[in-house]
Amino acid sequence: MSGNTTLLLSNPTNVLDNSSVLNVSVSPPVLKWETPTFTTAARFRVAATLVLFVFAAASNLSVLLSVTRGRGRRLASHLRPLIASLASADLVMTFVVMPLDAVWNVTVQWYAGDAMCKLMCFLKLFAMHSAAFILVVVSLDRHHAILHPLDTLDAGRRNRRMLLTAWILSLLLASPQLFIFRAIKAKGVDFVQCATHGSFQQHWQETAYNMFHFVTLYVFPLLVMSLCYTRILVEINRQMHRSKDKAGEPCLRRSGTDMIPKARMKTLKMTIIIVASFVICWTPYYLLGIWYWFQPQMLHVIPDYVHHVFFVFGNLNTCCDPVIYGFFTPSFRADLSRCFCWRNQNASAKSLPHFSGHRREVSGEAESDLGSGDQPSGQ
């Protein structure tokens, strides 16, 4: 393998050792030096990463602009910070993790010096934590909206506090990277790598550090999100059975479930799919890393392209979020349509009446946008 595969397989390049798993490499240096190369599998990884970078940057910036300046402002006031933070976390992943990974795979070794080694590894772990924790906040918000629909007055303040906590925790949990990573020159050869070699005196320290970040990055978010949506589904099922029992009585229903507004159900479906995409995209990568952790010899057995494909598949998650948001949000699609039609609008005065009619039509659609129908109840 070449490059640094971020987090779970951080330096699996035969640079200092061949058994580094997660963020560390504390084993003795290998006796026979094998110069890392920019392999065909790594070339595919770099090309795929650059494609994902372009799409993720454009789509997440579009979501952020829509929520802050466009029709996305029609979202309920407490939902806007959630969507904006999710897009921001994806942008941090896009502008930190993807370029770093691509360049590092091309150069194979580290050329940016010790300070940049520490900073980039810190930002990399911060980006991955923030992306996971923001999804936890979104799940907690939907959990509260469905199970406590009348408790809406503090929704915005509660979400802001949770988002602030998520960002601060991400910074704190990533801060050890500033101390354990450094630029190391391999003995006897002209080769420098950014690694954690020698930062841990005992193997159990390495294991504890690895396990801790595996739990905070994957296990804890997965457990919280699973618990939230399990309770939500149980509550929806309970309300559906209650509505069936009252089928003979006159009642007002705004969606397929009793007393749950259609806009709230639409937001719930969107967040479930966003969380599912996170789990689907990143699970293979994390499981492979844990497998290497307990069976490091498999690093020599499994083909290089498997690691590269799994990491690229994990990065695909940053592209999925804006696509899912756009599918469920007419206002975002309207903003994109307005952006693409802007040049045509200025090119021909005859197109103005038609364009204005189109905008009125989209505006009517946006009235049923997710969150807009939620605003009277605050959810």
UniProtKB/Swiss-Prot annotation:
Q: Which SUPFAM superfamilies match?
A: Family A G protein-coupled receptor-like
Compartment list: Cell membrane
Q: Which residues lie on this side of the membrane: Extracellular?
A: 1-45, 101-118, 185-210, 303-308
Q: Give the superkingdom in one word.
A: Eukaryota
**GO terms for molecular function, please?**
G protein-coupled receptor activity; peptide binding; protein-hormone receptor activity
In its UniProt record, which GO terms are filed under biological process? cellular response to hormone stimulus
Its Gene Ontology cellular component terms are: plasma membrane
**InterPro entries named in the record:** GPCR_Rhodpsn, GPCR_Rhodpsn_7TM, GphnRH_fam_rcpt
Q: Which residues lie on this side of the membrane: Cytoplasmic?
A: 66-80, 141-167, 231-283, 329-379
Where is the signal peptide, in residue numbers? none
- From the UniProt record, list the coiled-coil ranges: none
A Pfam cross-reference name:
7tm_1
**Disulfide bridge map:** C117-C194
**Main location, first listed in the record:** membrane
Q: Membrane spanning segments where?
A: 46-65, 81-100, 119-140, 168-184, 211-230, 284-302, 309-328
User: Its function?
Assistant: Receptor for gonadotropin releasing hormone II (GnRH II). This receptor mediates its action by association with G proteins that activate a phosphatidylinositol-calcium second messenger system.
What is the similarity comment for this entry? Answer: Belongs to the G-protein coupled receptor 1 family.
Q: Which PANTHER family match?
A: GONADOTROPIN RELEASING HORMONE RECEPTOR, NEUROPEPTIDE RECEPTOR-RELATED G-PROTEIN COUPLED RECEPTOR
Can you name this protein? Gonadotropin-releasing hormone II receptor
Give the species this sequence originates from.
Clarias gariepinus (North African catfish)
